[in-house]
Every structure is written in structure tokens, then in C-alpha cells.
Amino acid sequence: MSLRIALLNAAHDGEDNRRNFRRELDADLVEFDVTDRVLPDHFAFDACLVTGSRASVYWDEPWIADLESWVDDAIDEGIPFLGVCFGHQLLAHTLGGTVAPMDDYEIGYRTVEHDGTNPLLAGVDEEFTVFTTHSDHVAELPPGATQFAENDYGVHGFRKGDVFAVQFHPEYDPATAEDVASGKDLP
């Protein structure tokens, strides 16, 4: 029996997210377009995943407040979480950490190092290459969280209990990375 995972899709055009996570996860993904304020009305999932977004967690948007409230309740219910990019930042913020704008935009294939302590990256070389695209970062970890991955731009992975979060995009394939990078209007 496969896992039932709530895919809390925060991308404003979620087609790539949907395709990439369905390819990478052997699970029954139940998708919710959280940018339209669509959230589960229950907590009957084996796990939840919060995707990336072009939004910032500190924006005053009703959908972000709704998402953060639901995530907080789901964590209290003991549901395991994975956050990717915006999801990483949202989980940090929800758990009491600080998210802030960066001085430089991090985009492209980057080297990240992990400390070998986290089962999420078991079997991955301690120095590995990932695709990143973000202009915000976790400036301060939530109380009780442990960092397990980083690079020169900052925190790239943390864990608190059954909540795991990564700043990079493990789900991106080369076509998605190229599409995302070519669509950015950078200084």
C-alpha cells in the first residue's frame, strides 16, 4: 500500500511541481492549490509536502496565513512534513524561526554540504550539486531545530522532529531548471 501524501502546492502555476513530484515520489499524492486557499479539511495523510513558490512567507497574503495555520495544526497532529524552497521557509517560520530577504539571489546549480546525520540524505555524498532558486532564506532556525545542510548562501536543510526542510529543489529535472532560470528577471 502506498503512502498518501498531501501535496500543498504553493506554485502559482503548479504544473511543473505536480509532474516533478509525481515522478519522484512513489505515493498517492493528493494535491491542494494553496494559492487559491484550498487546503485539506482533515489530517488523514501519512505525510505532507509544501512546495516552492514565487511568494515570500512574510508577505501579507490570506493564502499564506491560511497555509501556515493549517500546517501548524497538522504538525501538532503529528503528521510528518517535507518543505522545499518556499516550503522550507514556511516550515521554519511556522516553527518559530526567522525568514529574511537575501542580499544576493541564489539561482542555478550549486554545491551544498550535509553533515551525514540526516536520513533524508542517506546515501548522498556529503558534498552534492542541486538546483536552487530563491531570494529569501532561513536567517534563524526554529528553536530545537538542527541544521543538516548548508552552503555559502546559508541553511539548505533543517529538521525538527518529523519536520524536514530543504532550500534546494530535489524534484527539479533539467527541463524544469532551464525553464525556471530562463524565466527570471534578475538584476
What label would you give each PLM region?
Residues 18-19, 60-63, 95-96, 143-144, ...:
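Short amphipathic alpha-helical segments
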Residues 172-187:
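Acyltransferase
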Residues 51-118:
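Cysteine-nucleophile active-site neighborhood
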Residues 33, 55, 87, 136, ...:
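Catalytic metal-binding/acid-base residues of hydrolase active sites
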Residues 95-175:
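Pocket-forming structural segment of enzyme catalytic cores
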Residues 1-69, 73-77, 187:
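N-terminal beta1-alpha1 cap of cysteine-dependent amidohydrolase-like domains
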